[in-house]
């Protein structure tokens, strides 16, 4: 039986792609092995959003050169955003790679894998591929939580971002197709559905002439089963009162708001081509806090954007102190080829970017400690994900997979529980990002 090794890189959206491509390989008769040396085919699904991502892609591709030298029959296939972004340079850089397939060509994946065509590189900037519930999928996440990608591409065109040029314009799946996928997943025992897209709040604009996110959520609400839904990647100015009001009464959609604000200074936001101002962020933050006693608000911010002054940075720090976020991720600005901001004046020194990043994360660490301290004594339903040393590791609805902290439960003194179980946990201790609890 043919064996395939998989190297997955990048974000949650790319993870869905990896799982679909693995589904295609499984249908072709491949089984999967963690040992690349025994593989007949190795698939590397890459990211290329920012410099660290495409550098990681390059390292992983080059890592396979030795495997190819030791096994001339090994088929190396590189997919993902790196292929789309660096298409013209691939053949010269990686002569040992057999096939490059960009995200827009995944509908041809099976035929390309099984053919012996002379053309090695297949990419399509005007991407039209979108997976459906009918496509095979092999989950690489635990089988009790999953990402569901509701749209592909992006129409926002932020000045620092390459995604619209790599993934194309917004393309939404139909509500009916998404509902069928969720029904299948729930029937298989999935307890946590994470809806993702480049911008979930623009879902449906291309199909229905307006955002259809609330309509989608209403349809998901009618699906029977023991599961909950978390929405990720929401655009600040598109978190509407209708969306908030629906989540407030929903029995399925949890009040977890992932809203990347990027910055709070109006001039910086304008240069980023973000279509909102600081007051809009305050309005959304305040509306959520007013409507939910227990909402989680997560955000992502960027430091070191061209022209960001010390005063602009201090404004950002002051903001997160005044309007604290339960979770905050951050990254430094990367001056990427092909972006509008590449040619902006006021490019900031790398050491200064890192200094600002460190200050920001140190500030958020203290904020997180204070917020976590308020959770002492509270009880939550927790899904057990894995074990680590003396602890069971799990998450409640308050912790998104991979990006947030976890809840740790000591094994000693706990009754017998298994991976995938949902248990009631009382919070006894806290850290900056993780919580420690005991079974109730």
Swiss-Prot record:
Localization per record: Cytoplasm
A GO molecular-function annotation: aspartic acid methylthiotransferase activity
Radical SAM core domain ranges (all copies): 140-370
Keywords from the UniProt entry: 4Fe-4S, Cytoplasm, Iron, Iron-sulfur, Metal-binding, S-adenosyl-L-methionine, Transferase
Annotated positions binding [4Fe-4S] cluster 2: 154, 158, 161
Cofactor binding comment, as recorded: Binds 2 [4Fe-4S] clusters. One cluster is coordinated with 3 cysteines and an exchangeable S-adenosyl-L-methionine.
PROSITE patterns, alphabetized: MTTASE_N, MTTASE_RADICAL, RADICAL_SAM, TRAM
One Pfam family from the record: TRAM_2
Predominant location: cytoplasm
Catalysis: reaction(s): L-aspartate(89)-[ribosomal protein uS12]-hydrogen + (sulfur carrier)-SH + AH2 + 2 S-adenosyl-L-methionine = 3-methylsulfanyl-L-aspartate(89)-[ribosomal protein uS12]-hydrogen + (sulfur carrier)-H + 5'-deoxyadenosine + L-methionine + A + S-adenosyl-L-homocysteine + 2 H(+)
Residue positions binding [4Fe-4S] cluster 1: 11, 47, 81
EC numbers on record: 2.8.4.4
UniProt KW 4Fe-4S keyword: yes
Top EC class for this record: transferase
PANTHER family, alphabetized: RIBOSOMAL PROTEIN S12 METHYLTHIOTRANSFERASE RIMO, RIBOSOMAL PROTEIN US12 METHYLTHIOTRANSFERASE RIMO
Function: Catalyzes the methylthiolation of an aspartic acid residue of ribosomal protein uS12.
Family membership noted in the UniProt record: Belongs to the methylthiotransferase family. RimO subfamily.
Protein name: Ribosomal protein uS12 methylthiotransferase RimO
């Amino acid at each position: 039986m043919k064996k395939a090794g998989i190297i997955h890189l990048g974000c949650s959206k790319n993870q869905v792609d990896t799982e679909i491509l693995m589904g295609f390989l499984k249908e072709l008769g491949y089984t999967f092995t963690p040992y690349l040396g025994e593989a007949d085919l190795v698939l590397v699904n890459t990211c290329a959003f920012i410099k660290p991502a495409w550098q990681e892609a390059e390292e992983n591709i080059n890592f396979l050169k030795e495997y190819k030298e030791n096994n001339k029959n090994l088929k190396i296939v590189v997919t993902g955003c790196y292929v789309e972004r660096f298409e013209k340079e691939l053949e010269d850089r990686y002569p040992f790679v057999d096939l490059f397939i960009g995200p827009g060509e995944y509908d041809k994946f099976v035929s390309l894998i099984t053919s012996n065509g002379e053309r090695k590189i297949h990419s399509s900037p005007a991407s039209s591929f979108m997976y459906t519930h009918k496509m095979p999928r092999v989950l690489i996440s635990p089988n009790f939580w999953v990402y569901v990608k509701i749209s592909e591409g992006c129409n926002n065109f932020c000045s620092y971002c390459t995604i619209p040029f790599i993934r194309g314009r917004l393309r939404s799946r139909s509500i009916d197709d998404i509902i069928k996928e969720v029904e299948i997943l729930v029937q298989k025992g999935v307890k946590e559905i994470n809806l993702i897209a480049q911008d979930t709040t623009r879902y449906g604009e291309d199909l229905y002439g307006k955002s259809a996110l609330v309509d989608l959520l209403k349809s998901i609400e009618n699906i029977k089963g023991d599961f909950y839904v978390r929405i990720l990647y929401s655009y600040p100015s598109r978190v509407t009162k209708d969306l908030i009001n629906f989540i407030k009464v929903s029995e399925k959609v949890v009040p977890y708001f992932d809203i990347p604000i990027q910055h709070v200074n109006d001039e910086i936001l304008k240069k980023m081509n973000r279509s909102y101002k600081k007051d809009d962020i305050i309005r959304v933050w305040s509306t959520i806090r007013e409507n939910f006693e227990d909402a989680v608000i997560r955000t992502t911010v960027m430091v070191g954007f061209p022209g960001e002054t010390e005063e602009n940075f201090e404004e950002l720090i002051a903001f997160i102190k005044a309007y604290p976020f339960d979770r905050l991720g951050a990254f430094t600005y990367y001056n990427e080829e092909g972006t509008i901001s590449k040619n902006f004046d006021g490019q900031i020194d790398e050491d200064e970017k890192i200094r600002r990043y460190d200050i920001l994360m140190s500030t958020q660490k203290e904020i997180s400690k204070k917020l976590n301290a308020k959770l002492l004594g509270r009880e939550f339903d927790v899904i057990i994900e894995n074990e680590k040393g003396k602890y069971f590791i799990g998450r409640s609805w308050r912790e998104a997979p991979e990006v947030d902290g976890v809840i740790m439960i000591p094994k000693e003194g706990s009754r017998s529980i298994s991976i995938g179980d949902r248990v009631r946990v009382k919070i006894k201790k806290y850290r900056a990002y993780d919580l420690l609890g005991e079974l109730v």
